[in-house]
Amino acid sequence: MSESPGKLRLGALVALVVGSMIGGGIFSLPQNMAASADVGAVLIGWAITAVGMLTLAFVFQTLANRKPDLDGGVYAYAKAGFGDYMGFSSAWGYWISAWLGNVGYFVLLFSTLGYFFPIFGEGNTVAAVIGASVLLWAVHFLVLRGIKEAAFINLVTTVAKVVPLLLFVLIAVFAFKLDIFTADIWGLKNPDLGSVMDQVRNMMLVTVWVFIGIEGASIFSARAEKRSDVGKATVIGFITVLLFLVLVNVLSLGIMTQPELAKLQNPSMAAVLEHVVGHWGAVLISVGLIISLLGALLSWVLLCAEIMFAAAKDHTMPEFLRKENANHVPVNALWLTNVMVQVFLIITLFSASTYLSLIYLATSMILVPYLWSAAYALLLAVRGETYENALAERKKDLIIGGIALVYAVWLIYAGGLKYLLLSALLYAPGVILFAKAKHELGKPVFTNVEKLIFAMVVVGALVAAYGLYDGFLTL
């Protein structure tokens, strides 16, 4: 594309969305869901998630179309609607969520390789960390070659990893047994699951994790060949991934019972297929997961760097994060991101951090950026901004924005106090970069309202720090 160097077409944007969302989560979905919910609650939970996440997808589509001048997605929307500190917090939270997720992906990737090579163990052995480090820096230098080139490789890996998922769904359809599916719909035989409402709430963080990446196209809005493709890519990607997730989860519950699924090791999809067709099924899914994780890692390294770069371009992050190399890659943002991943990979050697604990924390960090995006879409509709002579569209977007905002608040509630406090602990140190950016502009760090918000973050962070010290909070 010599006439538009480095620009991303619709297919590449859809692949970024699908590639970001289909990472490791879907391959562990049968066990992750069965651990907290039975059939009835799973169906209710997916219904809530489908409506909530679809409204979020529409939010990102609407904002991409109505505010095409805002680059950087979740960061830009929070800043435009609610000020500099909220914009910074969205960028900071999204960035931490993304690289924490990458650490989790590396752990899961080498845990899966441990199926073939026992030296990698559960993904946190010395050999696994060395292997993960080599792969991390290989991806790093690949991305340095250019966004377009990396996006093309992501397109290839996205296509490659969808094939084993399609095979799983086709085989599972024929292996599905209605009597297994309906054996204990509400989980009454397993009191540990709690009430149906408890089951639904407990599965929410997992459903959010498997959908993180829905905003991927909006993050790259400035690099899209057509701005209108950003919204299309978001909705196409969402519907594709939703179908896969629901089919994988629901069909598994008709092959093995909830207690059986809950006891499986991850990637549990491999064990489900092995139950149906034998050993080759587990090998197929394991290979699919490895390809999937490699693609997801690439997507998330791109997203990490881009969100910091977008915020720095707008003077909300410090100037040094604006630097691009000759291939138009935000080089300093990329280095900062991958150094943090490397540090936490080493930490996994000395801590009890597992894939799931990393994923829950990463999920909790992204809830605030989602909340502000939904709130901004609702704010535009309430004010009527960009809706001149479009009353019907304004009413529609009022409803969509309202549902998306309620859903975002529900997710924070479902995540629980523990992850709210741990999020505050990770949000608080970001003020150092925010203050540096403000100092470079010669402006005061906070407005009066922002001082109050930051004070609340600090209180939450102090409670979390004490909780970790005292032992009533754990990572």
Pin down the residues of each PLM region.
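Transmembrane alpha-helical segments of multi-pass small-molecule transport proteins
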Residues: 12, 47-48, 116-148, 165-169, ...
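Hydrophobic transmembrane alpha-helices that form the core helical bundles
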Residues: 34-35, 45, 54-144, 149, ...
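TM-loop-TM module centered on a large, flexible mid-protein loop between adjacent transmembrane helices
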Residues: 75-78, 83, 115-120, 190, ...
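Membrane-interface loop-to-helix entry segments
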Residues: 113, 127-180, 234-238, 363-368, ...
